[in-house]
């Protein structure tokens, strides 16, 4: 079973991937949508910030956060610097919260029934990790289609 430090490492890696996507988008494409595509990359980034702060930061970590889910999908032209600052804060917050979860707490029920069935904290964090990567993949694909550029290179480790 995954521990808090293992979850923290995974979220750290993939929140860095999300920030790299933001850096790779030019301003003209960040809020652009294509036919048949509902959300821009900018809106997906706002959504991931709100989702992870609400479910991991607030519900698991007890860190105050007032989510405005409607704004996550309706806001346009949020300054890049604001999104970058939100993602940088998220990249600090989420691993800290996850690393602090006690082994017994992973088996407790997540405090909110979001998916229609009670889930343990562990199960719900696994769901959130999949959700993060689903949207990071969408963002990457949008960037490639809109810019004509290929995959981002992996950072040196």
Regions found by a protein language model. Name each.
Residues 2-8, 78-81:
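Active-site rim elements
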Residues 11, 15, 22, 87, ...:
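Hydrophobic alpha-helical core bundles mediating ligand binding, dimerization, or RNAP-core interactions
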Residues 23-30, 103-106:
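Short, flexible helix-adjacent loops and helix caps
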Residues 75-112, 120-132:
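Acidic/histidine-rich alpha-helical segments that form the ligand environment
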């Amino acid at each position: 079973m995954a521990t808090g430090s293992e979850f923290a490492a995974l979220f750290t890696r993939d929140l860095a991937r999300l920030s790299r996507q933001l850096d790779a988008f030019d301003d003209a494409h960040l809020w652009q949508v294509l036919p048949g595509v509902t959300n821009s990359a900018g809106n997906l980034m706002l959504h991931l910030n709100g989702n992870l702060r609400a479910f991991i930061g607030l519900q698991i970590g007890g860190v105050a956060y007032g989510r405005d889910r409607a704004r996550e999908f309706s806001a346009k032209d949020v300054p890049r610097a604001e999104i970058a600052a939100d993602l940088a804060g998220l990249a600090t917050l989420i691993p800290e919260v996850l690393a602090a979860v006690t082994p017994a707490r992973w088996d407790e029920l997540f405090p909110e029934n979001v998916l229609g069935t009670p889930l343990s904290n562990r199960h719900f964090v696994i769901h959130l990790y999949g959700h993060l990567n689903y949207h990071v993949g969408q963002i990457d694909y949008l960037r490639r289609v809109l810019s004509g550029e290929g995959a981002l290179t992996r950072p040196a480790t």
